[in-house]
Amino acid sequence: MALSSFADGSLFGTRFGTAPPRVVALHGWGRSHQDFAASLEGLNALSIDLPGFGVSPAPCEVGGASMYAKLVAPILDICDTPVILVGHSFGGRLAVHLAEQRPAAIGGLVLTGVPLLHRAHRRGRPALRYRLGRLLHRWGVVNDGFLEGLRDKYGSADYRAASGIMRDILVTVVNESYEQQLRSISAPVDLVWGDGDDAAPPEIAARAEALLADARLTLLGGIDHFVPTTAPFALREAIDRRLGALS
């Protein structure tokens, strides 16, 4: 499908249907609007490339999910509000901020694989060599290039793939947790999770459900982190449920 530009050319994406969008889909880190092609077919919907991904230009400054939500918010002005926000992973971080910032415009959320909270049991400490490198850098013993080399070696796949301002944004975002936003959301939320999600384990979804005023958690057996592409019809079922509640 053809790409269209939005928000004065700062965002690009694909529209589904001919009427104003009632569903807005926000993809994960390193992904694109294409992830939602199967789950949005036949709807009046919009799937965008978030700033810095696909063909949408990167932001001009470093910030977290709240900043990204403000960059995406103009999309709501062309929609048939209240909309259903669909957020996968990084896109879900934005969705909870949008629900807090523009509550009247959001009629429901469908979230999948979103690191909404820090893990109950944090992963192991960084490699000893990397920890030592950070300490030496802080003392001025090694330069920025040396530390960057260690980050490239020991950082996550997303970190290694990012560069420039997008890498700084990633570092900001992965340290965020959204207890405040979850408690403030009044719109109903469907949490659709793969039981094999190791990027945002199901225990995060269960704890998030307890913080939300109106939430439903569905676990998908044998499904990984990438629900939009590995289980698009399960995602569509949740979208249809939220749309039905708006009618």
Place the predicted regions along the sequence by residue.
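Acidic catalytic loop of the alpha/beta-hydrolase fold
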Residues: 196-200, 225
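Conserved HGGG/HGGXW glycine-rich cap/lid loop of the alpha/beta-hydrolase fold
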Residues: 12-55
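Hydrophobic, aromatic-rich cap/lid helix
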Residues: 152-180
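Active-site loop/oxyanion-hole signature of alpha/beta-hydrolase fold enzymes
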Residues: 47-86, 237
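Gly/Ala-rich beta-loop-alpha elbow adjacent to hydrolase catalytic centers
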Residues: 87-91, 95
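Short beta-strand/loop motif that positions the catalytic acidic residue
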Residues: 184-185, 191-193
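Flexible "cap/lid" loop of the alpha/beta hydrolase fold
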Residues: 96-100, 105-139
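Catalytic histidine-centered segment of alpha/beta-hydrolase-like enzymes
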Residues: 223-236
